[in-house]
């Protein structure tokens, strides 16, 4: 019996579980930081326009919005969480590599870095004519597209016609039904110019990559949360998020240094290879990741319940609108800030350090969040400050004059993001019923990181295509400034409704009772002793 108890206590090792989860999220975030922030730069290198890149990124976010919660539910229902995590790591590491096979359809500002001409660097395009495209005002970059000659297209069609006529009539009839959809697909590709062909292929690969990569985060997070919840240690779960930001900062800085030093040898492929290597290195950590499956099933209407709670609270509705708007602006910044830095002469090392600074400043917000919240006396005012900070950040970006000048704005970006999610977390706790806190917080995350990000990427792509990056950031700053003023007035006018959370009250009462000295007695024991003394005094008197 004693041996079984020892095995059980060894099995539920909370500190070890948190350490393993921290290592896992550090490696995974490090790999993501090596590639995701630089993805739009690589698409620009391929010759895609800003509008095309906006459509690709918007499709990526929309796919995540739909597939992430559904895949998380399926992994839990069939008890395949670890399989999903390992499969997602390996698949995403391999699926992203075909993007390196696409030849560059453009000559960008970095073409003069290695003292070699760009046409010589792309010998795979002998039948192409490089035509310069008009760049919107406000951008210093020159983008080129590649259009195939009509001679090569007509020659290909003639060759296909000869081959088709050489087949027998019976063979044509049998192949017509089988290859008609395939022929229509290839025919539509042949009609497109080289730039649209590139856009269509990149969109397919990116969608497939997102499909295999997106189930990992929620699946791993759910397994750890339920593991800690089983042993009443969910307060340790928030400590894991810090390592996500540290890993992303390390990955961005590392790949910036590597690309800057190895660009003339292997070009932009360093980012992809770094991502693949780190995803594979994360697999052993995922095999040891603590995952627990509850025997009882959760209610399937958790998402609808969270929507009802948000819809029924005016303050929560304001918070939802705010996270959608901030998600739009944050997505636009993440997609096109590096474009602006590249136009100012920045190299990847500048970009990596600036991205790392934003992540580290986000982690540095936690120590001051408590005192700042007590000073403001209401977390809703911190939400207003976050919107104001993001507006100032975008305005600063629009007047960027050198690569290193972005660093003050990156410091402000980390604090603005930290203040935003601190306020959102507090708002989720205010309206949550027991067991719905995490679901409501994820609903706000989906509003911001998926829905808002999709709208922001789509709109930002067309704005940059038409007016330039500077106008994009100025417009985002004006929009956030107007909303921050309206938000402050509405926060002041709308009464605050806070639901009583009995689980938090019980936890607070437990902490208070544990901090009391042993000499102090429970109120029930004191009342019983007083009653006994009163009864004894009455008996003696009689």
UniProtKB/Swiss-Prot annotation:
Statement: the UniProt record of this protein carries the keyword Membrane: yes
Pfam families: MFS_1_like
Organism field: Danio rerio
Major place of residence: membrane
Membrane topology of the entry: Multi-pass membrane protein
Keywords carried by this UniProt record: Membrane, Transmembrane, Transmembrane helix
Family annotation (SUPFAM superfamilies): MFS general substrate transporter
Subcellular location: Membrane
Family: Belongs to the major facilitator superfamily. MFSD6 family.
Protein known as: Major facilitator superfamily domain-containing protein 6-like
Transmembrane portions of the chain: 46-66, 89-109, 198-218, 246-266, 272-292, 321-341, 352-372, 381-401, 404-424, 444-464, 469-489
Keyword Chaperone: no
Gene Ontology CC terms, in alphabetical order: membrane
């Amino acid at each position: 019996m004693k041996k079984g108890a020892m095995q059980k206590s060894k099995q539920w090792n909370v500190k070890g579980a948190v350490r393993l989860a921290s290592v896992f999220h550090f490696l995974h975030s490090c790999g993501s930081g090596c590639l995701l922030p630089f993805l739009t730069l690589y698409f620009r290198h391929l010759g895609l326009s800003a509008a095309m890149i906006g459509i690709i990124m918007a499709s990526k976010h929309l796919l995540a919005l739909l597939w992430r919660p559904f895949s998380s539910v399926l992994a839990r229902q069939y008890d395949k969480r670890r399989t999903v995590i390992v499969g997602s790591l390996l698949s995403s590491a391999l699926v992203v590599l075909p993007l390196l096979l696409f030849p560059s359809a453009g000559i960008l500002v970095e073409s003069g870095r290695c003292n070699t001409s760009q046409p010589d660097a792309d010998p795979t395009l002998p039948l192409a004519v490089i035509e310069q495209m008009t760049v919107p005002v406000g951008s210093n970059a020159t983008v080129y597209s590649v259009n195939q000659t009509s001679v090569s297209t007509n020659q290909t069609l003639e060759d296909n016609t000869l081959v088709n006529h050489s087949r027998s009539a019976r063979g044509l009839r049998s192949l017509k039904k089988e290859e008609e959809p395939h022929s229509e697909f290839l025919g539509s590709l042949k009609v497109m110019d080289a730039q649209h062909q590139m856009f269509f292929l990149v969109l397919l690969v990116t969608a497939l990559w997102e499909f295999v990569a997106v189930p990992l985060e929620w699946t791993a997070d759910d397994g750890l949360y339920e593991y800690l919840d089983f042993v009443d240690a969910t307060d340790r779960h928030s400590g894991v998020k810090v390592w996500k930001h540290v890993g992303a900062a390390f990955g961005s800085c590392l790949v910036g240094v590597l690309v800057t030093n190895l660009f003339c040898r292997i070009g932009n492929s360093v980012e992809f290879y770094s991502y693949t290597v780190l995803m594979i290195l994360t697999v052993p950590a995922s095999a040891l990741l603590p995952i627990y499956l509850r025997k009882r099933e959760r209610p399937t209407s958790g998402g609808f319940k969270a929507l009802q709670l948000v819809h029924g609270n005016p303050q929560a509705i304001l918070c939802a609108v705010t996270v959608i708007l901030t998600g739009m602006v944050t997505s636009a910044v993440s997609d096109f800030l590096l474009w602006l830095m590249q136009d100012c002469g920045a190299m990847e090392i500048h970009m990596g350090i600036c991205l790392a600074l934003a992540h580290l400043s986000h982690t540095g917000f936690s120590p001051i969040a408590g005192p700042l919240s007590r000073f403001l006396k209401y977390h809703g005012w911190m939400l207003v400050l976050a919107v104001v900070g993001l507006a100032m950040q975008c305005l600063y970006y629009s007047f960027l004059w050198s690569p290193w000048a972005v660093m003050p704005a990156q410091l402000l970006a980390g604090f603005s993001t930290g203040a935003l999610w601190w306020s959102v977390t507090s708002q989720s706790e205010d309206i949550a019923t027991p067991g719905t806190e995490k679901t409501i917080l994820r609903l706000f995350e989906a509003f911001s990181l998926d829905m808002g990000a999709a709208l922001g990427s789509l709109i930002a792509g067309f704005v940059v295509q038409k007016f330039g990056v500077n106008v994009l950031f100025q417009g985002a700053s004006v929009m956030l400034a107007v909303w921050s003023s309206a938000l402050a007035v509405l926060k002041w006018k709308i009464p605050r409704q806070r639901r009583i959370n009995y689980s938090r009250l019980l936890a607070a009462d437990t902490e208070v009772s544990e901090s009391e000295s042993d000499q102090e007695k429970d109120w029930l024991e004191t009342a019983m002793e007083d009653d006994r003394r009163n009864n004894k005094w009455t008996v003696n008197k009689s």
